[in-house]
Structures are given as structure tokens and as C-alpha cells.
């Protein structure tokens, strides 16, 4: 790989800004926080150079265009699918062509589920085709389907109160949308709770903050000792319509057909690339997003955007001829949508070196206009991150909020490694999440430029500071 020896922006020699004196004695920092603040402030011109390149310079729109090429070419990338395998191989080649270092694939085993053909039709009180999306890991119905009367409930509590009515029926959940973290339990646990009271299947109102007759899929979980029943999500509109019908005392009958099957686990890979550290190469700042998606839409928002701004962060740093003291590592996870399967296998493989991880970063809540970071770590680490984020004042992206957790980095965070997630405008995120609407049309190249600049500045500065982030 070639690195630029000199890079000038506004007459400033970037590499001179990266030099730092040794501040360790017997492994203990002797610096005051004011000295740390001064060190971070010295990266101001580096941050401006990254911002200029990403937002206004030759690299603007690059992450968007790279992403569009992949998702238009490959499409959705379900765990275990040929599409995911193809995307991984394409990204492996892309990272090599980008002249990043130590590009490699780390193998693992991941779930392989396919939805097959599926349909739902209301037979009573009138004929009405119901849009559905089967949920990940659901079983299928018999070939002839399941035809049964419907019981509509709005909560698990109501289901328990009406348990005697549920046997032999299809339970329809019309739970209100509060927020994703509180409402998603109906998607993940709806089938189990319905099966406990003798239901034949469950249909769940999509976990969406807005709907234009769009079902949203996602993972669901069975429980040992509880019968497994078919389960799918339906649109907000159909859930509300059936709730209104039921409140009038009208009998509702649905025929449900699902061809879903689970196959043996299959081979897959986490995709890795680096810029090797100049002084502490064994120490790591990790940036990441997941390459897999659900099998609807294009997986552009979830999580193509996060994966591609993570790649872009390394590209920007490489293009400026910068080499941080620590290794900056990109990981594109496999099988996140099945519960962080690829990330867990990565953690199991690398946790022996956990003391060398300074910061783990994940972007998996969209790449809309960012306002800052969500961060989990010690108070001292948070104070450092607040100073780092002040470098992004030119973009007005300076917030540091709590809860930096993400599915793929939680393993590290729970073990004490500081973690960060991109904080961006989520207003429209759950309009499109896990639906046919997750396409490149959702993405905004200018917003991706800003997100990539944030990702690059934060990862570079933390990787280049003389000290790792302090832990509790």
C-alpha cells in the first residue's frame, strides 16, 4: 500500500499534527485532563481536512455511490443466502482495490432460514388479501395452510385474560407503537405467548412508526417446551382494521399459508480491513456495520449505510496519507439480523486481546443527518469523547449521549470496552426498517458524507492519541 508522505490543506502539514510525546511512565499516565484536552485540540486541522475531503472535496458522495452499486447489483442479503455470499466476496475485492491493509475474511457458521411462498387471505367477513412478511426462524404451515378464526388482542396482558378464547385460533396482535425497544417484544415473543394459550398461529402488527400498507419483518424467538407455531407480521392498517371489526363483534376468519423453512447452518465470513498502527499496532479502534440484511428491500439503510460509512472512514484517512498510532480496523459483520451471530464469533476469537481494544464503534441505526454519538464507557472516557466531538463543531455534530450499545459491539461493551454508536435523526428510520421500503431512495448522499466525516474524525483521533481511552 502507498501512503502519502506529505499532505497540505490550507498550508498545514497534516503529519506534523499527529506527532506526540511519550507520556507513560511505568504504564501510568502522568498527564492532567487539561493536557489531554490540549492534545485533542491539536487535531483541529486534521479534523477540518477530513471534513473538507468527505463533505466538500473529491470524496463527497463516494460512500453513497459505492453503496448504491452494491445494493443495486446484489440486492438484499439474507443470512445464509447466495446474495450475502456474493456481497462478501465483492466487498473483499473492493477493500483490496482500495489498498487497505490486512484485508481478509474470518470464517464462521450462520443460520440459514428462507421464507418461501407466503400468503394470508381474510375469508370472513369479506374476502381481503392481507400483506404479510414471515418472521425470521418461523416454521411454515402445512401445504394446505391454516384456516382459523381470529382473536385480536392489544397486549400480552389481554391475551392472558382471554386465554380461554385463544385455543385453535390465529392470534392477531394490534399492540400500539410506543418505541422500538418496548414494542419489538411483540414481534420476538408473540408466537411463544400465543402458543402457550393454544393458538395455531400469530400475526403481529408491524413494529413501525408509520405505514403505507407495508409489513415489516425481523427475527422472532421460539422457547423450549412451547409448541412452535407459524408467525408473521402484518401491516398497521390491517391490524387496526381487524381490531375495529372485532370490537363490533364480527367473526374474522383467515387462511394463512407460509412456506418458511430452516436449513442447517452455513459458512459465512466477517470481512476485515485495516490501517495498521504506526506505534501501537497491537492496539485497536474498531469501526463497523453489518453487511447482511433481511430479504426484502435492498438493505440500503439497514445496514448498508453503516457498513459503507465505516469503509469510508478508512478510505478518507488513507487518502489523506494519515496513519494513526493504533490500528484502525474495519469489520463488516455477517448475520447481525439473526442476533449478532457473526459478531459473537468475532468476539470469541479476539477477546483474548480485549485489553488492546480502545474503542468499538458501530453504525446500525441509519446514516441520516448525525448530531453526535451515543457512548458507553467510564466518566473519564466520556469526558475525552466530549473533547473529541468538539472537533466536529464545523458540522454542528458535537453531542455525546448515553447508550452507545449496538447488537454487534455489545459483547465488548459488557466486558468493559468503551463503545460508540452514531447518533442521527431517526424520525424516518422505522418507516422503512425491515421492509420493502428499505432501498437507496431512503438514502441521502449529503447526509452520508457528514456521517462518514464524523466516523473518520472520531476513529482517527481516538486511534492516534497517545493514550487509550480510560476504562472504569
UniProtKB/Swiss-Prot annotation:
Oligomer status and interactors: Homodimer. The monomeric form is inactive while the homodimer is active.
Gene3D superfamilies annotated for this entry? 3.50.30.30, Zn peptidases
Q: Name one GO molecular function term.
A: metal ion binding
- Keywords from the named record: Carboxypeptidase, Endoplasmic reticulum, Glycoprotein, Golgi apparatus, Hydrolase, Lysosome, Metal-binding, Metalloprotease, Protease, Secreted, Signal, Zinc, Zymogen
Q: According to its UniProt record, which protein family does this protein belong to?
A: Belongs to the peptidase M28 family.
Q: Which residues form the signal peptide?
A: 1-20
Q: Which SUPFAM superfamilies does UniProt cross-reference here? A: Zn-dependent exopeptidases
Q: Which residues does the propeptide include? A: 21-44
Which EC number(s) does the record attach to this protein?
3.4.17.-
Stored Pfam families: Peptidase_M28 (PF04389)
The protein's matches in InterPro entries, at most eight in alphabetical order, are given as: CPQ (IPR039866), Peptidase_M28 (IPR007484)
How this protein is processed and modified after translation, per its record? N-glycosylated. The secreted form is modified by hybrid or complex type oligosaccharide chains.
Q: Where does this protein come from, organism-wise? A: Pongo abelii
Purpose of the protein: Carboxypeptidase that may play an important role in the hydrolysis of circulating peptides. Catalyzes the hydrolysis of dipeptides with unsubstituted terminals into amino acids. May play a role in the liberation of thyroxine hormone from its thyroglobulin (Tg) precursor.
Q: What is this protein called?
A: Carboxypeptidase Q
> Does the record carry Zinc as a key word?
yes
A GO CC annotation given for this chain: lysosome
